[in-house]
Regions:
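Secretory targeting signals
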Residues: 34-37, 46-48, 52-63, 107-168
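A structural motif at transmembrane helix-loop-helix junctions in multipass membrane proteins
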Residues: 151-186, 192-201
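Aromatic- and glycine-rich beta-strand/loop motifs that create alpha-glucan
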Residues: 1-25
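Start (N-cap) of specific transmembrane helices in multi-pass transporter permeases
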Residues: 10, 14, 99-112, 116, ...
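Long, hydrophobic alpha-helical segments
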Residues: 58-80, 112
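Terminal transmembrane helical anchor/hairpin motif
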Residues: 41-48, 183, 187-253, 257-261, ...
Length: 276
């Protein structure tokens, strides 16, 4: 346990030294406050509209940003150490590969987690301070759900980055694979499901299609945050289809957490067999 904590502390200190957490936090604050006040500018309105609209807009934006940030943070976690010669050095200590992987994941995982809490938490405080007649309980619940689910989404893609890093032999290969999986989960997956739905004229197994959304952590993330919001009544396409999923929110939370565990287990399985 001490070895895991030591590795985690080193990774966190490296992240703080590189100012990743500060940069991500500031980005999230600016985006959240900007969307809250200028999200409806296209319709000629400026100012805070509603909690539901703000969270819905933030969810759509975070679906693109958070996976990309997580992949950029961790794509070289294993292969980078190997190329630099430090991986072999680390493994000469009384430290198993599993301890090394878990320690690095915990340390690096704290960076986007703390940045998400600080960034979006500060935005929620700013909204509460500047908007009168606001239901603070609704604001707290909506942003808490959004922050926790954003952390889980980031961890899922960070675990995926560890799997890619354990598989790749060069950092450039890991970077290319990371970009590829980002395109797949954020853009291509939903487009393929929509194409399937259109090609079948809406007749492709209406019972099966909503369950296919569970194969993409970004779709699970969107369903967690948009289900129950007034903005959810205006959902179209696959998001509207996901509302017919016969599973409650607890199941969605569980599946998103399972994504993190399974991907991290696969990363360990590949790392344990990686030649050094």
């Amino acid at each position: 346990m001490n070895a895991i904590c030591s590795i985690a502390r080193k990774e966190l200190q490296d992240g703080l030294r590189n100012r990743w957490m500060l940069a991500i936090s500031l980005l999230f604050v600016v985006l959240a406050v900007g969307i809250a006040w200028f999200g409806a500018a296209a319709s000629g309105q400026v100012g805070f509209s509603s909690i539901d609209a703000t969270v819905a807009s933030l969810t759509s934006l975070a679906t693109f940003l958070i996976p990309l940030i997580a992949l950029l943070l961790a794509y070289d976690a294993i292969v980078g150490e190997d190329e630099g010669g430090t991986l072999l050095l680390l493994l000469t200590y009384p430290l198993s590969r599993g301890q090394l992987l878990l320690g690095k994941f915990l340390g690096q995982g704290l960076i986007p987690a703390l940045a998400t809490i600080l960034g979006f938490g500060a935005a929620a405080v700013a909204i509460a301070a500047m908007v009168s007649d606001l239901n603070l309980t609704v604001l707290f619940v909506a942003f808490s759900r959004f922050i926790v689910s954003s952390i889980l989404l980031g961890w899922a893609f960070m675990a995926l980055a560890y799997l890619l890093s354990a598989q790749a032999r060069e950092k450039s290969s890991a970077a290319g694979m990371a970009l590829g999986v980002w395109f797949w989960f954020v853009l291509v997956f939903d487009l393929l499901l929509l194409a399937l739905l259109v090609a079948s004229k809406g007749q492709f197994s209406p019972q099966l299609l909503p369950w296919l959304l569970l194969l993409n952590p970004t779709d699970i993330y969107r369903q967690i945050n948009l289900n129950g919001l007034n903005a959810g009544n205006e959902m179209t396409g696959l998001l509207a289809l996901g509302q017919s999923l016969p599973a409650d929110t607890l199941v969605l939370w569980s599946v998103l957490g399972l994504w993190v565990i399974l991907l991290l287990a696969l990363a360990y399985h590949r790392f344990a067999r990686r030649p050094i």
